[in-house]
Regions:
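Beta-barrel outer-membrane channel/assembly domains of diderm bacteria
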Residues: 2-117, 134-144, 183-188, 192, ...
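Extracytoplasmic/secreted cell-surface and envelope-processing proteins
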Residues: 120-122, 155-158, 200-202, 241-242, ...
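Long, well-ordered mid-to-C-terminal structural blocks that present hydrophobic/aromatic surfaces
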Residues: 247-291
């Protein structure tokens, strides 16, 4: 099975070698790689953070360490050094971001550790949030992966959970158990899974536990079909959850379609997104600059669905002027029901325009400039103006 396909399952897997309870020979190889970024951002108008002009610089270095033992066990670790806002000392962080191990067996593999939850496409709500995972995969059928897993969002007194599985409060346990599979047909990857959510956290020091059970069903497609690049994903949540001090129905539905076509140096694409009943898309979803923190827009409009049930439609064009220079443009329409942005609580229409440029200074060095503007159909909201430039280095 193509090892690159395993990455789409959900994960990059990581635990420290000492946690394996055995000595491992790490003499086979040790690879160190990573990336560094310095960027400046200027924002004016209403944003998810404030309604005044803001100029910031930040920097980030990510270092990956990978090794393979003589017996084929793969160990991965990543350290992130963040200086989120220059001049603000409280935003300086050093984090052991990932730590995982992949143990190959005949027709099986075991994958375990602290990983980024990257199931399917970037639309998945917890995309790149941290989970602690134990994952068993079966690869005995050609071009097919079957798997089962258990992951923790909250364990014991550790109360840092991700956005998909709940707020970062409460002590106790929050577990997810699931079964899934995926198959590669020509150039198209198709996958699906069922996940059971069990929330047994306590907000009052152990006097009362939530004892709620929910689930979600997820399916995705990613790859190429009929000459088109395709990403599609749908997730339906059910069962119950804990909100406002009581059990309530867990109902959320998210749908995503991204289609693109390459014409020599020109690429044209279209994206359609729908979120209902509280579904919030992943943070790495690049539907527009103002909904994608990875594009450097300070999450100005936050994740798609974060301000209310949303329908987002966008058209994108990218053109390679030469091997070093790329330009791109996007126009996006956001329709949000009872939008909570700036405590509005009204239906809101947003029209967004994006323009970007990427220039490859050297083989591993890229300079980016991005500009975004957004206008609202509500007169009491100031239009957004957002500009970002950055240096990105791979090593």
């Amino acid at each position: 099975m193509n090892k690159k396909r395993l990455a789409s399952v959900a994960t990059s897997l990581v635990i420290s070698s000492s946690a394996l309870g055995a000595e491992l020979s790490l003499l086979s190889n040790l690879e160190i790689e990573g990336d560094a970024r310095v960027r400046g951002i200027s924002t004016s108008g209403i944003t998810s953070n404030s309604d005044k002009a803001k100029e910031t610089y930040d920097s980030r270095i990510r270092i990956n360490l990978n090794t393979t033992t003589d017996s084929g066990v793969k160990i991965h670790s990543r350290v992130v050094l963040d200086n989120d806002t220059w001049g603000k000392t409280s935003d300086k962080n050093v984090e052991w971001d990932e730590a995982s191990v992949l143990v190959p067996l005949k027709d099986f593999f075991v994958y375990a550790g602290r990983v980024n939850d990257t199931y399917g496409t970037p639309f998945y709500g917890s995309h790149n949030d941290k989970i602690d995972l134990a994952f068993i995969g079966y690869t005995g059928i050609e071009n097919t992966l079957l798997y089962g897993f258990d992951y923790k969002a909250v364990e014991g007194a550790y109360n840092s959970s991700n956005g998909q599985l709940g707020s970062s409060t409460g002590d106790g346990d929050y577990d997810a158990y699931g079964l899934g599979g995926q198959i590669t047909i020509d150039k198209l990857l198709l996958g699906g899974r069922y996940v059971s959510l069990q929330d047994n956290r306590s907000d009052d020091g152990g006097k009362t536990f939530r004892d709620t059970k929910g689930f979600f069903v997820d399916a995705f497609a990613s790859g190429e079909i009929a000459g088109l690049e395709l990403q599609a994903q749908i997730q339906q949540n059910g069962g119950d959850k804990y909100s406002g001090g009581k059990k309530v129905d867990l109902e959320a539905l998210g749908m995503y379609l991204n289609v693109a076509k390459q014409f020599d140096r020109l690429k044209i694409g279209a994206i359609a997104i729908s979120t209902e009943d509280g579904y919030v898309a992943g943070g790495d979803l690049e539907a527009s600059y103002l909904t994608s923190p990875t594009n450097g827009a300070i999450a100005t409009l936050g994740r798609v669905g974060g301000y209310g049930d949303t329908v987002l439609l966008s058209g994108q064009v990218k053109y390679d002027i030469n091997p070093e220079l790329l330009i791109e443009a996007t126009i996006a329409s956001h329709s949000i029901k009872k939008a909570t942005l700036n405590s509005l609580n009204k239906d809101l229409e947003i029209t967004e325009y994006n323009l970007g440029l990427q220039y490859k200074i050297a083989k591993d060095v890229t300079y980016k400039i991005q500009y975004a503007a957004a206008s609202f159909d509500q007169g009491n909201l100031d239009d957004i103006q957002n500009a970002m430039h950055s240096i990105n280095i791979k090593f």
